[in-house]
Amino acid sequence: MTGTFITVEGPDGAGKTTQLQLLADRLTAEGYEIVMTREPGGTRIGNEIRSLILNPDFQEMDEMTEILLYAASRAQHVNELIRPALAAGKIVLCDRFIDASIAYQGYGLGYTIEQVRSINQQATNHLTPDRTYLFDLTVSESKQRMMDRGALDRIEQRDDAFRQRVYDGFMTLAVQEPERIQLVDANQSIESLQTELCKDVLTYLKKRERLS
């Protein structure tokens, strides 16, 4: 049986990581085999690349270098962890994937969407998530949550205009792929959001099982 690849996306501070862990706990309790991971990172090599990308000391990093580092981390991640887990029939829950690169480096930095998408399709051999949950959080609320959290990484330090372009990019992707990308209101309480997320994921998994 082929596994299921589920990703979560959205602005920084939207609560994706917390919700993904709660979802993993619930699915494990339901008897599913879960692999929970994140980008950039997910592997030993990917985590080293992550430290380069996010380090605030590297403000001189060229934008194309940033794009390629994300893709390099993703290539390692897909081949070392994600594809083997899917081949074993597991559910992979991933905090960010290619949609993030399209939103942040495509819409955010102003590179063509086709260019960013092409680089990442080569890096992943065209792997696409089965289901993506896009956490909808305004730029102002995202910024406030990040400030409350403390020190900002190199990407989080970018200005509000960048954040707005990223947000608009995510919303555009949701319109373009409504079957795959499900919008989630990130302003809900943790409990309410978790109830909504778990309900949809379990419904989706049961549907896939019936069709398999």
Swiss-Prot record:
<dbReference type="InterPro" id="IPR027417">
    <property type="entry name" value="P-loop_NTPase"/>
</dbReference>
<dbReference type="InterPro" id="IPR039430">
    <property type="entry name" value="Thymidylate_kin-like_dom"/>
</dbReference>
<dbReference type="GO" id="GO:0006233">
    <property type="term" value="P:dTDP biosynthetic process"/>
</dbReference>
<keyword id="KW-0418">Kinase</keyword>
<comment type="similarity">
    <text>Belongs to the thymidylate kinase family.</text>
</comment>
<dbReference type="InterPro" id="IPR018094">
    <property type="entry name" value="Thymidylate_kinase"/>
</dbReference>
<keyword id="KW-0545">Nucleotide biosynthesis</keyword>
<keyword id="KW-0547">Nucleotide-binding</keyword>
<dbReference type="GO" id="GO:0005524">
    <property type="term" value="F:ATP binding"/>
</dbReference>
<dbReference type="GO" id="GO:0006235">
    <property type="term" value="P:dTTP biosynthetic process"/>
</dbReference>
<dbReference type="GO" id="GO:0004798">
    <property type="term" value="F:dTMP kinase activity"/>
</dbReference>
<dbReference type="GO" id="GO:0005829">
    <property type="term" value="C:cytosol"/>
</dbReference>
<comment type="function">
    <text>Phosphorylation of dTMP to form dTDP in both de novo and salvage pathways of dTTP synthesis.</text>
</comment>
<keyword id="KW-0808">Transferase</keyword>
<dbReference type="GO" id="GO:0006227">
    <property type="term" value="P:dUDP biosynthetic process"/>
</dbReference>
<feature type="binding site">
    <location>
        <begin position="10"/>
        <end position="17"/>
    </location>
    <ligand>
        <name>ATP</name>
    </ligand>
</feature>
<keyword id="KW-0067">ATP-binding</keyword>
<protein>
    <recommendedName>
        <fullName>Thymidylate kinase</fullName>
        <ecNumber>2.7.4.9</ecNumber>
    </recommendedName>
</protein>
<dbReference type="Pfam" id="PF02223">
    <property type="entry name" value="Thymidylate_kin"/>
</dbReference>
